[in-house]
């Protein structure tokens, strides 16, 4: 199945096949979600079957909206598809744009809508093994330190988020 995502072609937002957008390095829309419980962040380790960055640690979930899908609907859909999380209140933290080489000749050039959820109770997480091989809750400071000392264990986008945008994501400053 060809998944069509919103990407900019010659300055116009158009439906583009997802893999083609990555091969061409086209700027495209994406979402990233960070679920917090107290001072910890829910992280996922990407399944080994993923077509890029397999086995690396990433934020709670991230994906591309389908053409004509809202960012908020996309975030909720992907939380369920990857981790079977439902009914989490999501707060929009604004947009972040980045460009990163993710290997195999693929480029992520994303305009990402960031969402967060702060859970007072620890949610039940059931990873979809086709998407996620492992999850963990990691203290924010410990995560920042690990990203600096062992960057190759983390996806390029999580490294960018933690090193350049974490105040925006965590809500300690406005977007």
Annotate each language-model stretch with its function.
Residues 1-32:
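Acidic, metal-coordinating catalytic segment for phosphate/diphosphate chemistry
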Residues 17, 55, 97, 106-114, ...:
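Nudix hydrolase/Nudix homology domain
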Residues 22-31, 36-77:
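Conserved Nudix-box catalytic region and its N-terminal flanking loop in Nudix hydrolases
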Residues 33, 61, 92, 113-115:
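A structural signal for short, well-ordered beta-strand segments
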Residues 82:
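Short alpha-helical functional segments enriched in proximate histidine and acidic residues
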Residues 86-95:
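A short coil-to-beta-strand element that immediately follows conserved catalytic motifs
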């Amino acid at each position: 199945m060809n998944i069509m995502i919103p990407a900019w072609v010659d300055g116009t937002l158009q439906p583009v096949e997802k893999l083609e957008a990555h091969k061409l390095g086209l700027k495209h829309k994406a979402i990233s979600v960070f679920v917090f419980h107290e001072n910890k962040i829910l992280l996922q380790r990407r399944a080994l079957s993923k077509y890029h960055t397999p086995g690396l640690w990433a934020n709670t979930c991230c994906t591309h909206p389908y053409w004509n899908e809202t960012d908020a609907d996309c975030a909720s859909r992907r939380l369920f598809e990857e981790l079977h999380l439902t009914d989490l209140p999501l707060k929009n933290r604004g947009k972040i744009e980045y460009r990163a080489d993710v290997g195999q000749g693929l480029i992520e050039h994303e305009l990402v809508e960031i969402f967060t959820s702060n859970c007072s109770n620890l949610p039940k997480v059931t990873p979809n093994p086709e998407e996620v091989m492992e999850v963990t809750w990691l203290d924010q400071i410990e995560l920042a330190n690990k990203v600096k000392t062992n960057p190759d264990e983390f996806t390029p986008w999580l490294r960018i988020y933690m090193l350049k945008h974490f105040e925006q994501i965590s809500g300690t400053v406005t977007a």
